[in-house]
Swiss-Prot record:
It catalyses: thiosulfate + hydrogen cyanide = thiocyanate + sulfite + 2 H(+); thiosulfate + [thioredoxin]-dithiol = [thioredoxin]-disulfide + hydrogen sulfide + sulfite + 2 H(+). HAMAP family: Thiosulf_sulfurtr. This is Thiosulfate sulfurtransferase GlpE. It comes from Pseudomonas paraeruginosa (strain DSM 24068 / PA7). Keywords: Cytoplasm, Transferase. Residues 17-105 form the Rhodanese domain.
Length: 110
């Protein structure tokens, strides 16, 4: 089990996602609704406890924010909560959207 997260580029995040990694988006609900990585799950301070309770702590977890800054703190938090394979997306959703515009979706969080 690692006690630190890894910062990764969109290319690595996409490969992890294609191999079944959970992708969580920690941006505000309005930003998520306007655009997010396809298949990602929106979480906030209210839903994080339920997410952790239901999550596979050993499965890869990619954390996404706006530009890759806030996701680092969130990734460290997930490590503290027992996740063993955590990544922070460098450049955040903004870089992802510029690199993979076809791999984005819009709409409210489920």
């Amino acid at each position: 089990m690692s006690d630190t997260f890894q910062r990764i580029a969109p290319e690595q995040a996409r490969q992890l996602r294609e191999n079944g990694a959970q992708v969580v988006d920690i941006r505000d609900p309005q930003s998520y609704a306007l655009g997010h990585i396809s298949g990602s799950r929106h979480i906030d301070n209210h839903s994080v406890v339920d997410f952790i309770a239901a999550a596979d702590l050993d499965a890869p977890l990619v954390v996404v924010c706006y530009h890759g800054n806030s996701s680092q703190s969130a990734a460290a938090y997930f490590i503290q909560q027992g996740f063993s394979d955590v990544y922070s997306l460098d450049g955040g959703f903004e870089l992802w959207r510029s690199v993979y515009p076809a791999d984005t979706s819009t709409g409210e969080a489920e």
